[in-house]
Design a protein with these regions (language model features):
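Conserved ABC ATPase "signature" region
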Residues: 103-121
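H-loop/switch region of ABC-family ATPase nucleotide-binding domains
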Residues: 186-187
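Catalytic Walker B motif of ABC-type/P-loop ATPase nucleotide-binding domains
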Residues: 150-153
Length: 236
């Protein structure tokens, strides 16, 4: 709040329903700050200017219920997000908080358990899960709310490469099969790059490039910071 320079500056970004968008950049570039502005309940304090609209409505005007139902958020550390001790309780927590009908809740939970392939550990304690399973549980617990927009802040930062790849594949299924709009910040680009529709590169709180993965190499060829982190298949 007392920083001399704004955390974000000159941001102009429009995302269409059903898009899969990757936001990347060095630590401190503002990507996580930007992501959190899309869910007011999680946005940072401080002076703000500009406006964000969700389905034509100023995002600050969304009720807590609308935010909870329509905008999902997955954090870096699953331990900071999981609130119950059992897998099935975690899947039910959000729906119970909104007073969802019991029958509807059971149907949704069963569908998500099947979709995410977690039926084998549905009755397990959360403490028995691996890091990858815990993050998958966080994703499932958010998706069971049937959000229109899914925000993910470096969700694979604590996962090994195999678990990260599986997580990305599940995320792509959510986007393509459920039609959910996905915005993700990530530092692992190799597997994720071919899956997304658009890549947004940020530096010092501003967007420096906003393009398709196919155009990224050409647009960033003279930018050593970003060109060097592109997947090798794109740089060729």
């Amino acid at each position: 709040p007392e920083a001399a320079q704004p955390a974000l500056s000159g941001i102009n970004l429009e995302i269409q329903p059903g898009e899969f968008v990757l936001i990347c950049g060095a630590s401190g570039c503002g990507k996580s700050t930007l992501l959190r502005q899309c869910k007011p309940a999680l946005s940072q304090h401080g002076e703000k200017s500009g406006a964000i609209y969700f389905n034509g409505k100023a995002i600050e005007e969304l009720s807590f219920r609308e935010q909870s139902e329509k905008i999902g958020f997955v954090m870096q550390d699953p331990e900071m997000q999981i609130v119950t001790d059992k897998v099935r309780h975690e899947l039910a927590f959000g729906l119970e908080s909104l007073g969802t009908d019991n029958r509807k809740m059971r149907v949704r939970i069963a569908e998500m358990a099947s979709f995410f392939g977690i039926r084998d550990w549905f009755d397990s304690p959360v403490s028995a899960l691996s890091g990858g399973q815990k993050q998958l549980l966080c994703l499932a617990a958010v998706t069971v709310m049937q959000p229109q927009l899914l925000l993910l802040d470096e969700p694979t930062s604590q996962l090994d490469p195999i678990a990260a790849g599986e997580f990305f594949n599940t995320l792509k299924r959510i986007n393509s099969e459920l039609g959910t709009t996905v915005i993700i910040t990530e530092h692992r680009l190799e597997n994720l790059f071919p899956m997304v529709d658009r890549v947004v590169f940020m530096r010092s709180g501003s967007i420096v490039s906003n393009c398709s993965p196919a155009d990224a190499a050409e647009k960033l060829r003279g930018d050593d910071e970003f060109f060097s982190v592109l997947p090798s298949s794109v740089r060729i």
